Curated annotation (Swiss-Prot):
Gene expressing this chain: coq4
Cellular component GO terms held in the UniProt record: extrinsic component of mitochondrial inner membrane
Main location: mitochondrion
Name this polypeptide is given: Ubiquinone biosynthesis protein coq4, mitochondrial
Native organism: Aspergillus clavatus (strain ATCC 1007 / CBS 513.65 / DSM 816 / NCTC 3887 / NRRL 1 / QM 1276 / 107)
Catalytically driven reaction(s): a 4-hydroxy-3-methoxy-5-(all-trans-polyprenyl)benzoate + H(+) = a 2-methoxy-6-(all-trans-polyprenyl)phenol + CO2
Primary role: Lyase that catalyzes the C1-decarboxylation of 4-hydroxy-3-methoxy-5-(all-trans-polyprenyl)benzoic acid into 2-methoxy-6-(all-trans-polyprenyl)phenol during ubiquinone biosynthesis.
Cofactor(s) essential for the protein: Zn(2+)
E.C. designation(s): 4.1.1.130
Subcellular location: Mitochondrion inner membrane
Similarity-based family: Belongs to the COQ4 family.
One Pfam family here: Coq4
Pathway: Cofactor biosynthesis; ubiquinone biosynthesis
Keywords, comma-separated and alphabetical: Lyase, Membrane, Metal-binding, Mitochondrion, Mitochondrion inner membrane, Transit peptide, Ubiquinone biosynthesis, Zinc
Complexes and interactors: Component of a multi-subunit COQ enzyme complex, composed of at least coq3, coq4, coq5, coq6, coq7 and coq9.
Amino acid sequence: MSLLGRRGAGLAARGLTPASPAIAAYVRPFSAVNRPPPKYPGHVPLTFLERGALAVGSAVGSLLNPRRADLIAACGEATATPYFIYRLRDAMLSDPTGRRILRDRPRITSETLPMSYLRSLPENSVGRTYATWLDREGVSPDTRNSVKYIDDEECAYVMQRYRECHDFYHAVTGLPIFVEGELALKAFEFLNTLIPMTGLSIFAFVRLKPAERERFFSLHLPWAVRSGLASKELINVYWEEILEKDVDELRRELHIERPPDLREIRKMMRQQQKREKERLEQQA
């Protein structure tokens, strides 16, 4: 009898056939044919091994190329389950505003928050600050990837909400989108949300220039630790309802300390380097 035949006979002797529930439960998760149906539009169910491979591959890829938003998004979803995204969902359920957000399911796009309206708001309002930041950085709220690798539909929305609120965090803190600013914000987000991807992103400091690295560890990482530990859960902020609120007042309410202005620091460094270069040329 062949090896396959002996294995089949052994299974039959124990009452197990390829069609039996015990075997099907083992085989089904690893079969593309038997992959469970999606639980919401765009959902891609993954096996444990597939999720692990996605987590490792996307983490390495995003470290090599921090501008790959798709890899960063995939890493965030693959590493958020099974615990961390549920913790964030539970934080919303335990908060009155968080529960309203989960019930209403608002989305942040250029249609739900028209730029013309945001630009018309008072100068120091949350909405005007958000619009000014978007204009300065040249980004749009419509560029966020849709969640697809989180199985629970409600948790998928929580991740989508975090993702779409990310630019509000940028605007309130004033941090820019280049690598140094993103690292500072990700460190802050990790201590506020505990989403693993935000913590893993910090390792991208190896891509910083020596001066940027020194600045990150001496200025912005300490800021991220202070504000991240002291601040309230940002996932429970209903941004759409506070667009006219004074942004300084909001920072005080959320216990967010404004970090050193990276753009001003860089500008001062360039001016200093220019003056030093001119001085050396005059001495030559």
